[in-house]
């Protein structure tokens, strides 16, 4: 005697709007949650015209006027560095974030391609909107194209917001410890 297996009910799928009425799973409205971080704003190479807005953002974040430092870093990025990797994020026609970084082919006797993240900032009015993630996403993409293997930075141990952000984008503590000695 034969045993009859149960038969599944027919599967039906809602007809799509594409050719052949298939469903277009790549349609922008269907997968907004998968957008790349760098698509949240216009991220491009930093220019000298961005200086005033970068200084404004940095002053709002640090509470200090670091215009001389920012100016030196921007000049270094524009003229002294063979590879420009510093970026600015624009939204609503204004600079709303920046990342200053530099490519380094080694230090302390090491010869490995490393980038150093000098400073990053996002306008307080645009925090928690993916601007920082967009900047670092584009920075990492650009550095990978240059065959840079690693990005390093230094963070104050009490800057919990920045530490949390850096952990969130994949940074982890290194095996090196920075030492400082005051000279009187």
Over which residues does each language-model region extend?
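Acetyl-CoA-dependent GNAT
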Residues: 36-41, 45-49, 56-112, 118, ...
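Conserved GNAT acetyl-CoA-binding A-motif
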Residues: 143-155
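Conserved beta-strand-loop-alpha-helix junction that forms the acyl-donor binding cleft
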Residues: 127, 153-163, 180
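Conserved active-site alpha-helix within GNAT-family acetyltransferase domains
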Residues: 133, 145, 157-175
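Conserved N-terminal entry element of GNAT/NAT acetyltransferase domains
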Residues: 3-49, 184
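General detector of folded, globular domains
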Residues: 102, 107-108, 133, 140, ...
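Conserved acetyl-CoA-binding loop-helix of GNAT-fold acetyltransferases
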Residues: 122, 128-141, 168
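Short coil/turn motifs at secondary-structure junctions
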Residues: 104-106, 125, 158, 184
